[in-house]
Amino acid sequence: MAPSALLRPVSRLLAPARLPSGRASARSKFYVREPLNAKPDWLKVGFTLGTTVFLWVYLIKQHNEDILECKRRNGLE
């Protein structure tokens, strides 16, 4: 592959951004909305916190079982 072919995509990245011409540039494509954290979705918050608590409890329980198994195998108990 020729070096110029490799540099072509890089030169596009380094080139200054082109603004769209015509009427489209005068109107915003984005809508101004209320911030998402102004009105939280309590169902999602509950599921997220519940899942987090469940995973931590399961992790600690599994860790304790693994420690007991390790002690049993090594004859420490």
Curated annotation (Swiss-Prot):
Residues 1-28 form a transit peptide. Pfam families: NADH_dh_m_C1. It comes from the Eukaryota. GO terms for cellular component: mitochondrial inner membrane; respiratory chain complex I. The chain crosses the membrane at residues 42-60. InterPro entries: NDUFC1 (IPR026192). Disulfide bonds: none annotated. It is found in: Mitochondrion inner membrane. Keywords: Electron transport, Membrane, Mitochondrion, Mitochondrion inner membrane, Respiratory chain, Transit peptide, Transmembrane, Transmembrane helix, Transport. It is a single-pass membrane protein. Complex I is composed of 45 different subunits. Accessory subunit of the mitochondrial membrane respiratory chain NADH dehydrogenase (Complex I), that is believed not to be involved in catalysis. Complex I functions in the transfer of electrons from NADH to the respiratory chain. The immediate electron acceptor for the enzyme is believed to be ubiquinone. Belongs to the complex I NDUFC1 subunit family. This is NADH dehydrogenase [ubiquinone] 1 subunit C1, mitochondrial. It comes from Pongo abelii (Sumatran orangutan).
